[in-house]
Amino acid sequence: MKFSDGYWRVREGFTAAWARQTHDIAKTDNGICAHASANLVNGRGDSLGGPVFTVTLSTPAEGIIKVVEEHFRGAVNPDPHFHLNIDEDANFDIETGDGATVFRAGSLEVAVSNPGEIWSMDFRANGHSLTGTSYKGLGAYTEQSTGIHYMREQLRLALDEKVYGFGERFGHFVKNGQTVEMWNSDAGTSSDAVYKAIPFYWTNKGYGVFVNHSEDVSFEVGSETVGKVQFSTKGHRLEYYVINGPEPKDVLRRYTKLTGRAPYLPAWSYGLWLTTSFLTDYDDATVAGFVDGMQERDIPLSVFHYDCFWLKEYHFCDFEWDGDMFRDPRGTIAEHHRKGLKVCVWINSYLSSISPLFDEAMSKGYLLKLPDGSVYETDFWQPGMGLVDFSKPEAREWYCSKLEKLIDMGVDCFKTDFGESVPTEVVYEDGSDSVKMHNYYTYLYNKTV
């Protein structure tokens, strides 16, 4: 999201204030806390009016520095939040010099301009500057017509610096010059819309940045200011982590230590998969023809995947095989296993209102609701479909119980489709903010499975 009109002017319809001068720096139990005023304070009278930003620095692990920037500190910060692996005993050092106060977390340090100086933070490793921010980098913006508040930060880019990341993307691999939005959608694969948006990037200068917000984060990668990566989100608080390398594998190792790592996958999952894809009319004979055809051509298979029409039409997704098309699914799966194949079936987190499973889920309160208490329904994919509320532990257990029956039948794995188009006007059982849950929902869905 762009907040400027060219280089000099603020975008029409917005007001802005920027961190301009360091006012004070204090040590805390786990780092330092600095205040940066939007005014140049040369005397006490200059302190009347105008925002003051609170910037807190700490470390969750060696080589990582956490930055929290706040405008109004009393603003609500509702769930959900990503679970991070924080080392409460991570070592750090603080050193005060003539021009800056240095906070050091092992191989990574940040130098904060001392009180009275123009506000700046410079992130360094091995004696080299990696990135940083200065006056007009950290800012608070308000859209005058709506009263919506935004927090924005800009981190410096070198002339030859290349930026990568942001999750699954279908455009150019190098992100410089792009506007990148963190908003999951049922996108296809030929636009800037994506299924898996991840607010993390890394650069060829040996560091990465993770912006710890589950809601929409907007990145301007050298696209609003050519020498900066800008990120912004609604509200009065911005939290991000600068992660040292120096090699890409070092950045990713530290990043995944912070956010969590996927378990090791079974060896068979790396083999060749064959799918019905979106073939809408197939049965046991069709599947047998596919599998036998691969064998006749000496093409080794590892997994056969049944896409959505293993289910009865208008019954997605009630986890019941279409008995008219698949007479003996247990026996067919056993035959696949005898041929050395694993079996995968397609699922999603939506329930057609025609399926009896919808009534079961509705009666137990397992579906997302509207503010008036009605079940949220849409004809988007299936008639009157509802969405499972994965914020409710009982709903997660119930959903898993349906998968367990398929596993007992012999199914080896699941394709967890959909979940990206969750609306923002719904109410969650645990009270989570519906905008922040839009992206987080797919995480809960996949974690449940």
Regions found by a protein language model. Give the residues of each.
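N-terminal accessory segment at the very beginning of proteins
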Residues: M1-P263, A267-S269, S277, Y282-D292, ...
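Aromatic- and carboxylate-enriched substrate-binding clefts and catalytic-loop regions
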Residues: E70-F72, E143, P300-V449
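Ligand-site clamp/hinge motif
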Residues: L272
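Append "and occasionally in soluble cytosolic enzymes with long acidic Gly/Pro-rich linkers
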Residues: G293-P300
